[in-house]
């Protein structure tokens, strides 16, 4: 990376520190359209997310700017994979990429990739958790489980992703194969430098309203004849190929409260940030592949929400979508109690590391919350967390089983 590229990156870092008090009147011109940069929303690595406004329509966007310095070709590939992931998973609880653009950096030979995403004014679940901690409040169990349920529906769209052919919508609604065939996706066109390629909705239309991003059918509206108890087997083996025929499971690999936006209705969750997404089933034949996967997890998966099998990847195993189930368990715990179960103050006092605690499954509920009776949340709620936080990935429930348990818990709160 040359000096000019370093200076350019330093500018973004400066804006990150000073926030909205700088560059509020800056105007960015892309493909003949002008966008006013209002403030910095977040940053990470070589990427920055800004609140941008179309000067013509006044519409607000979350503009993600990804720097890909010269000599780092892998960073371009990784950024493009993130764009493809947004287009691959079409679901009401998964964020849409409204438009994307690849441009040549004016400072060096690198590339800059812009992603136009919907702007959600209510922020993320992490913002709510932080506010609860500051104000001494907490999520009501029913509201929390409802948000968690919508998040699980998004994860199911990844874990049960069809190989090719039927659209995600067809799979969700149970459309017949004949109807699905008629609605095949043609696949996204290639991104060209200096030009955009909108998916189904562009910057000119649509909105990020709750109507557009509502959950699938609310479990409270389902048939009252639904069975009352959900039995979860102790073992969840990796399904044989015949059992997943037609499916291509993907794993998000970085599920956490900060990656769950809240739509304008303040109750519809929107799963975001697919830069870490990978095909779920990854065989580990040797130590080289094990170390590669371990390094990828260290780079892309937040430690407090990382599954134990990703801290020390073993040879002769297959990594699966069960890593997301663990992250969901940590996320639900954090929604209820303020932090991941493996980064609590109690653990810090004992000097334990997050990695060792996760690999040993060492966590506890806050005082008064672990008993069968009492506490702010039900025993059924705590049992849901316990099931997801099994150290052995084969013992964790599938995403469908998690959804079933969550719906059962919601029904019992009626």
Predicted feature residues:
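Protein kinase glycine-rich loop
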Residues: 38-45, 49
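Activation segment/activation loop of eukaryotic-type protein kinase catalytic domains
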Residues: 191-239, 246, 258-303
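Juxta-kinase regulatory segment immediately upstream of eukaryotic protein kinase catalytic domains
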Residues: 1-30, 38
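Glycine-rich ATP phosphate-binding loop
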Residues: 48-68
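Short beta-strand micro-motifs within the conserved protein kinase catalytic domain, predominantly
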Residues: 96-113
